[in-house]
Design a protein with these regions (language model features):
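Mid-domain alpha/beta scaffold segments of enzyme catalytic cores
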Residues: 1-269
Length: 269
């Protein structure tokens, strides 16, 4: 079984500084062949690029996204824009295959909705200009996120395959709108929780060729590791639960979601 974890924050040194090599060995033993390093800030993005280079011989393949999370939108200034452009101009040699994670988040008040929207729209423009998918974060901001994405879609400034809504927690109705615009949906540990309500119905509805698996490590570890630090090896539990919901084998789900990730992020990833 070969699994592609499409969202992991292994660049957070405080979380993995003592055992990153063990974490990667665990991932390899669990069947994880590829990890997408998620980024939230300019500093975070730089560390992702460093980790990819430093751990290239680990037996697990890495790809990177670069971008500024909505919680850091107040720091999305001219310097941040310049740095993203510099990286994106050299995306192939740096292993950058997406812009992210970007989006809207009203759960905390780190940045105003106006700042978040500005950073989101600008970075969606970068994704379009550099022909890369966007990795989109949405929390407690579904209406405004959909408004922005629909506006970009109607203006024809979204790629044909525009990206993925990572850690998707929306309704079936919202999922259908996103699927109609060409998006993929990413799922992680919460689908294994007993109180999972929306996700099972969304997964059952979603076409197999639009599903992705992720961990969002170090957050949201799946059952049976809920409450502990998450790591890419645990993505197998997400695969198993998605397979159960779609009534196929875990091996088939791993194969399909890996092929989906490679189709979205590039066949060479």
């Amino acid at each position: 079984m070969e699994i592609f974890d499409t969202h992991a924050h292994l660049n957070w040194r405080e979380e993995y500084k003592d055992d990153i090599d063990e974490v990667l060995e665990n991932a390899k033993n669990a069947g994880v062949t590829h990890i997408m390093l998620a980024s939230s800030t300019i500093e975070d993005s730089a560390i992702s690029l460093e980790v990819r280079k430093a751990k290239s011989g680990s037996g697990v393949k890495f790809s990177c996204m670069v971008g500024v999370h909505p919680e850091d939108a107040t720091n999305f200034n001219d310097e941040a824009k310049w740095q993203l452009e510099q990286w994106l101009k050299h995306k192939d040699e740096l292993g950058i295959v997406a812009v992210g994670e970007i989006g809207m988040d009203y759960h905390y008040d780190d940045a105003s909705p106006a700042y978040e929207a500005m950073a989101f729209i600008y970075q969606m423009g970068l994704a379009y200009r550099y022909d890369l998918p966007a990795v989109i974060h949405e929390r407690d901001a579904c209406e405004d996120t959909l408004f922005i994405l629909k506006s970009l879609y109607e203006q024809k400034v979204l790629r044909e395959v525009p990206g993925v809504l990572h850690c998707f927690s929306g309704s079936v109705e919202t999922a259908k709108i996103l699927l109609d615009m060409g998006f993929y949906l990413g799922f992680d540990g919460p689908i294994t929780f007993k109180n999972a309500r929306k996700a099972p119905d969304v997964i059952r509805m979603c076409p197999l060729d639009r599903l992705l698996v992720e961990t969002d490590s170090p957050y949201m570890a799946p059952v049976p590791h809920r409450g502990h630090r998450n790591e890419p090896a645990y993505v197998k539990y997400v695969v198993e639960e998605m397979a159960r919901l779609k009534e196929i084998s875990p091996e088939e789900m791993a194969r399909i979601t890996t092929e989906n990730a490679q189709r979205l992020f590039g066949k060479d990833t």
